[in-house]
C-alpha cells in the first residue's frame, strides 16, 4: 500500500495577507516598548515560556515551581498535560498570564505510542487511522475535569511514524480539547482488537514547538541564576518569549498611536483608529489588536469583517475583551 505524504498543517500555520487602510500612518519611536527592546524585568512581566514539561508532576505543579523560582505573583499555562505526559507546555508570566486564551484556536500536536491488543496487518492500520482525520465525536474521560458531554473535535492530520508488531508510533495534529487517550481507544475498536495509549508527548501548542525556544526546568534554574547572580541576562532572555509570540497565529488589527491609550483605558476599538488589518476576518473572530511596533495591546472579538473595517469610516470594529498593555505606554491623545 502506497503511503501518502502527510501535510502537517495546524490552524496556527495559516498565512494571512495584510490589507492597508492608511498608508501614511507612522508610529512615534518615543512611545511603547517593542518586544525586542524591553528591559529584562519588563520582558519577564510580559513573557511566556515554551517549557518542556517532564513526565511526573501535574501541569499546575510545574507552574507553581516556575512562580516560586521567579518569585512571581501570577502565571498560567496553555493546555493541561496529564502527569505522565511530557512536552510543550506554554507558561505565561505575570501581565501575560491571560494570553494563553489565544492558544485555544491554534491547534496542538502530539506524538503517541499506541499498543494494540492483537495483531493487525499494516495496511489495515494505515487505512483505519486515515479515517480518523476530520471531525470526530468524543466524550471526555471519566477522570477529566470537564463535564462528560459528547462533543465534536477536529483531527487535522495523522502520520504513522513507525509500526513494530503491536506498537504504533504516530504523530497527530488536533483541535484543542481533543483527548488522545480516547482517540486511541476508538482506533483500537475500529481495528477490532482494542488498544491503549502507552506513551504521549506534546510536540506543539500553536506557535510553540520543539525548537530552540523549548527549555527545561533545569535550564530555567541555571539561566535565572546566571542573570540574578552573574548579571548575564542573554540566556534567560532567550528562554522567555514575548507575549506577542502567543498571538502569532491570530488575525490582527493594527492601530494608530493615537488610538492605543483609549483601548488600554477600556474603550472598544473604533474604525478611525485602524491602520491595517489581516484579510479574511469574520464577525465573531478572536483578533489581536496590535500597535504599529507589533506590540500586543488587547484581544477582542471582531464586530466587522476585514472589508467593513477598510470601507467604513465609523463604528466599533472590535469588542475588546482582554487588555495587556499598561495604560502609561502611550499618551492620552483624546
Swiss-Prot record:
Residue ranges occupied by any PUA domain in the UniProt entry: 250-325
Pfam families (alphabetical): DKCLD, PUA, TruB_C_2, TruB_N
InterPro entries reported for this sequence: Dyskerin-like, PsdUridine_synth_cat_dom_sf, PsdUridine_synth_N, PUA, PUA-like_sf, PUA_sf, tRNA_PsdUridine_synth_B_fam, TruB_arch
Active site: 82
GO BP annotation list: box H/ACA sno(s)RNA 3'-end processing; mRNA pseudouridine synthesis; rRNA pseudouridine synthesis; snRNA pseudouridine synthesis; tRNA pseudouridine synthesis
Molecular functions per Gene Ontology: RNA binding; tRNA pseudouridine(55) synthase activity
Record keywords: Isomerase, tRNA processing
Keyword Isomerase: yes
Catalyzed reactions per annotation: uridine(55) in tRNA = pseudouridine(55) in tRNA
UniProt EC number: 5.4.99.25
Function in brief: Could be responsible for synthesis of pseudouridine from uracil-55 in the psi GC loop of transfer RNAs.
Family the entry assigns: Belongs to the pseudouridine synthase TruB family. Type 2 subfamily.
PANTHER family according to UniProt: CENTROMERE/MICROTUBULE BINDING PROTEIN CBF5, H_ACA RIBONUCLEOPROTEIN COMPLEX SUBUNIT DKC1
Protein name in UniProt: Probable tRNA pseudouridine synthase B
Source organism per UniProt: Thermococcus onnurineus (strain NA1)
The gene coding this protein: truB
Amino acid at each position: 500500500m502506497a503511503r501518502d505524504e502527510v501535510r502537517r498543517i495546524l490552524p496556527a500555520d495559516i498565512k494571512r495577507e495584510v490589507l492597508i487602510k492608511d498608508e501614511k500612518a507612522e508610529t512615534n519611536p518615543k512611545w511603547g516598548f517593542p518586544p525586542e527592546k524591553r528591559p529584562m524585568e519588563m520582558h519577564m512581566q510580559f513573557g511566556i515560556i515554551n517549557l518542556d514539561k517532564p513526565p511526573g508532576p501535574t501541569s499546575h505543579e510545574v507552574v507553581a515551581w516556575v512562580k516560586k523560582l521567579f518569585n512571581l505573583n501570577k502565571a498560567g499555562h496553555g493546555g493541561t498535560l496529564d502527569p505522565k505526559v511530557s512536552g510543550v507546555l506554554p507558561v505565561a508570566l505575570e501581565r501575560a498570564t491571560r494570553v494563553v486564551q489565544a492558544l485555544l484556536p491554534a491547534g496542538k500536536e502530539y506524538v503517541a505510542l499506541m499498543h494494540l491488543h492483537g495483531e493487525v496487518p499494516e495496511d489495515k492500520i494505515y487505512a483505519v487511522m486515515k479515517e480518523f482525520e476530520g471531525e470526530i465525536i468524543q466524550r471526555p474521560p471519566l477522570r477529566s475535569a470537564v463535564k462528560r458531554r459528547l462533543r465534536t473535535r477536529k483531527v487535522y492530520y495523522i502520520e504513522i511514524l513507525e509500526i513494530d508488531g503491536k506498537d504504533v508510533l504516530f504523530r497527530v495534529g488536533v483541535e484543542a480539547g481533543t483527548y488522545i487517550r480516547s482517540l486511541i481507544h476508538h482506533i483500537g475498536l475500529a481495528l477490532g482488537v482494542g488498544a491503549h495509549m502507552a506513551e504521549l508527548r506534546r510536540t506543539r501548542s500553536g506557535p510553540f514547538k520543539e525548537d530552540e525556544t523549548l527549555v527545561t526546568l533545569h535550564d530555567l534554574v541555571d539561566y535565572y541564576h546566571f542573570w540574578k547572580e552573574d548579571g548575564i541576562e542573554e540566556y534567560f532572555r532567550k528562554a522567555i518569549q514575548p507575549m506577542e509570540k502567543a498571538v502569532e497565529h491570530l488575525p490582527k488589527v493594527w492601530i494608530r498611536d493615537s488610538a492605543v491609550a483609549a483601548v488600554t483605558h477600556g474603550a472598544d476599538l473604533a474604525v478611525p483608529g485602524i491602520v491595517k488589518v489581516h484579510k479574511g476576518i469574520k464577525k465573531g473572530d478572536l483578533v489581536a489588536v496590535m500597535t504599529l511596533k507589533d506590540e500586543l495591546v488587547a484581544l477582542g472579538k471582531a464586530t466587522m469583517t476585514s472589508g467593513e473595517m477598510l470601507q467604513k469610516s465609523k463604528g466599533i470594529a472590535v469588542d475588546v475583551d482582554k487588555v495587556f498593555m499598561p495604560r502609561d505606554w502611550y499618551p492620552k491623545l483624546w
